[in-house]
Amino acid sequence: MADAAGRSGVEVLCIGTELLLGNIVNGNARWLAEELAALGLPHFRQTVVGDNRDRLIAEVREIASRSRVLITTGGLGPTPDDLTTEAIAAAFQTPLEERADVWADITAKSRSRGREPGPETRRQALLPVGATVLPNPTGTAPGMVWSPTDHFTVLTFPGVPSEMRAMWQATAAPWFRQSGLSSGVFVSRTLRFWGIGESTLAEQVRDLLNQTNPTVAPYAGRGEVKLRITACASDQPEALALVDETERDLRSRTGDLCFGADEASLASVVLAHLRARGETLAVAESCTGGGLGAELTAVPGSSQVLLGGVIAYANAVKCELLGVPSSLLEEVGAVSDPVAQAMAEGVRRLTGSDWALALTGIAGPGGGSDEKPVGLVHIAVAGPDGCESHPIRLAASQGRDWIRLVSAGEALNRLRLRLMAAESGQTHTEAEGH
C-alpha cells in the first residue's frame, strides 16, 4: 500500500481537549480500529490533539508526510473551538467555500427538530474547495472526504459516537472497499475464559500464539482472560473458515474454561442456559451489594429468568428476609459456607426460583482477620439437585471493586458449570469440584 514516497497505512486523529483531559473515554478510536481491521486496512497510529488550530495544522501535515489516509473524529460542530475543517484546509493552504447543499440540509434538519439554525451553525457548511461531502444521517455536522494531494486523503467525522458510526457504515466503509487500499479481508473473534490465568492459558496454546494466520493474542480484562483470533483472506468466507478452525482447536484444548465469544458475558450465557431449560434464578448478596444482580439485569430479556434478589448486608436482614438462623451466625459468622448456603436456600424459598446464588465475604479494605482475611468470599449455588458452597480467596491488593467484580463472575461461572453438568448427567458434587 506504500506509494513512491513511502507513505502507507491509515492513521486516526481524535480531536478534542476533553479527550486530553480524560473527561470522556475515547471509544471512537477503539471502534475505528476494529472497523479498519475488518476491512483489511493497515492501521499504524492513533493520535489525540486538543482544540488548538496551530497544533492541528502541524499534526495534519506530519500525518500527510507518512500516511496515505487520515481519519479524524471531533471538531465539526458550530462552536468556535470546532476547528477541524478549518485546520485541515489551512494545512494545505486551500480556501473554504460555503456549500449551498450542505447548508440546505442543515437548515432542514434543524427545522424538523423545531428550531431555526443560528448564524454560528453556518460554519458547518464550510468545506475546502474540492472536498466531497460525507452526509450525516443522524446529526447536522457533515463530514468530508478530500484528497488535497495525489497521495493523501482525509475523511472527517463528528465526535458523537452514534453519528460517527452511522456515517461510517453509510459512506466511509463503502468508500474504503472501493479504494483499492485494502490488503484483504480481516475477520476477528474473541473467545472468553473464566477460571484460568492469562499465563497458564498462554502456555497451553503456545503453538497457536506463534502462528501468523490466523493470529491468536491473549489479554486479560475484568477477571477473565480473552483470546482474540484474527484471520486475513481474500474474502470473508475464507477468513471466517480460518477463524472457525482455530476456534474449534482452542475449545477442544480448553474445554469448559471457555464460556463464550465476543459479546457473550457470563451473565448472558447463564441466562441463556436457564431460558432454554425453562428455569428461573434469584440472588442473595452481601459483599457484592447488588453487583451480581446488576450483571444479570444488564442483559436484555433477563426478566424472563431472574425473579429477584436480596441485598442482605446486615445480619438482621439475613435472618428476617432470608431465614438464616441467628444461632448459625453466632456459631460460624456471616462469612462462612453454612451462611452462604442458608442465604441461597432462603432466597430460593422466598422467590420460588429454581436456582439461587448467594455471596458473603469481606471485600475490604478493612474488616479482615487472620482467620478471615480481606478477599475471602463464600459462594453458594442452590438448585433442584441440592446446595453447595465453597470459598474463594482473592488478592486484597487488587482492591474492593475488583474483589466484588470477580466474586460476582465466579458465582455466575459456578452456576454455569452446574447447569452444564446437569445437562450432561453429571452430579452437582462433580460440577462443584471442577
Curated annotation (Swiss-Prot):
Gene3D superfamilies: 3.30.70.2860, CinA-like, MoaB/Mog-like domain. This is CinA-like protein. SMART domains: MoCF_biosynth. PANTHER family: NICOTINAMIDE-NUCLEOTIDE AMIDOHYDROLASE PNCC (PTHR13939), NMN AMIDOHYDROLASE-LIKE PROTEIN YFAY (PTHR13939:SF0). InterPro entries: CinA, CinA-like_C, CinA_C, CinA_KH, Competence-induced_CinA, MoaB/Mog-like_dom_sf, MoaB/Mog_dom. Pfam families: CinA, CinA_KH, MoCF_biosynth. Belongs to the CinA family.
